[in-house]
């Protein structure tokens, strides 16, 4: 996200100024909603431990043809970060559905990444039972731990999930964060220092670093609800696409292989051979091109 080379660059503070805080299920949630209401709508769901700002590199390109709605989920970005809250994927899905209802969305596309993929799986399961809010037109999943058996968590993530988690929070500084975060990017698409500083700043808004050990419980959720969430992918009546950075050590090519083994619905697949865990940040032009091709195929 180089501000010098990209005229469409949006800084985190500019991003904040373009959105607003909305009260959803009793929590103050940051929402950015741009584009004419007559355009097709995309709801964008971000990953851990970052925020809706992850979508900034492809925002301008998408906004030419779509109304875009992104939120910082509870505990992330500019949204509330309650310390004692019991965070869960189901709870985040409830907030997303509250947003869908507040915006009075009848039908829309979903574009998700990482933690957002898991939220999307729960929402997709609700769609399949007729209990979901609104009607999905499609769902596109970027790199994420769709299957707990193929999710190769970083050591830091495993420690955060342990009883040592809350103590590790206190010891994690910018240097440790930048090293771990950069490790999941592709070898030729590492984040710039400016990007790392921005991601770290967003994490620390509202003292967010200190709830990492509460947010990381989504890894347990994935195991507990595996059957429901994998079944949602297998039985989906909604077109599904996967755009995957293949060299992602957490959920790269090995995750795609498992996706195929389990015969999950797959209407479109793009494998980016030298890209890591954050395709929309590392290769925004390619992600936009593939996503638009997927949508075009639906017509």
What role is predicted for each listed range?
Residues 235-277:
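Conserved loop-alpha-helix segment in the C-terminal half of the alpha/beta-hydrolase fold
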Residues 33-78:
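Conserved HGGG/HGGXW glycine-rich cap/lid loop of the alpha/beta-hydrolase fold
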Residues 1-42, 63-66, 101, 105-106, ...:
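Alpha/beta-hydrolase fold catalytic core
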Residues 150, 172-234:
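Conserved alpha/beta-hydrolase catalytic His-Asp/Glu region
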Residues 50-60, 78-81, 150, 224, ...:
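Short N-terminal helix/helix-N-cap motif within the alpha/beta-hydrolase-1
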Residues 272-288:
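Catalytic histidine-centered segment of alpha/beta-hydrolase-like enzymes
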Residues 106-151:
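Conserved hydrolase catalytic core segment
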Residues 13, 24, 32, 70-112, ...:
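Active-site loop/oxyanion-hole signature of alpha/beta-hydrolase fold enzymes
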């Amino acid at each position: 996200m180089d501000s010098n080379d990209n005229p469409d660059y949006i800084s985190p503070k500019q991003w904040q100024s373009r959105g607003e805080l909305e009260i959803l299920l009793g929590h103050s949630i940051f929402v950015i909603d741009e584009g004419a209401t007559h355009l097709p709508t995309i709801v964008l769901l971000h990953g851990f431990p970052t925020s809706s700002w992850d979508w900034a590199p492809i925002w301008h390109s998408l906004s030419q043809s779509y109304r875009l709605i992104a939120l910082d989920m509870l505990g992330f970005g500019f949204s509330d970060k309650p310390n004692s809250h019991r965070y869960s994927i189901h709870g985040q899905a409830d907030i997303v559905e509250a947003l869908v209802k507040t915006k009075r969305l009848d039908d829309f596309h979903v574009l998700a990444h990482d933690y957002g993929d898991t939220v999307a799986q729960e929402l997709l399961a609700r769609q399949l039972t007729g209990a979901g809010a609104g009607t999905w037109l499609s769902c596109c999943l970027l790199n994420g731990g769709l299957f707990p058996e193929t999710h190769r968590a970083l050591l830091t993530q495993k420690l955060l999930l342990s009883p040592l988690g809350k103590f590790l929070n206190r010891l994690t500084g910018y240097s440790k964060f930048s090293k771990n975060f950069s490790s999941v990017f592709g070898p030729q698409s590492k984040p710039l220092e400016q990007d790392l500083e921005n991601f770290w700043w967003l994490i620390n808004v509202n003292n967010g670093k200190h709830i990492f050990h509460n947010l990381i419980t989504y890894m347990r959720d994935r195991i507990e609800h595996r059957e429901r969430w994998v079944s949602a992918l297998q039985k989906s009546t909604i077109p599904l696409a996967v755009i995957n950075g293949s060299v992602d050590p957490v959920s790269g090519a090995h995750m795609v292989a498992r996706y195929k083994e389990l015969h999950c619905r797959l209407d479109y697949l793009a494998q980016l051979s030298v890209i890591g865990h954050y395709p929309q940040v590392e290769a925004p032009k390619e992600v936009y091109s593939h996503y638009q091709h997927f949508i075009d195929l639906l017509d």
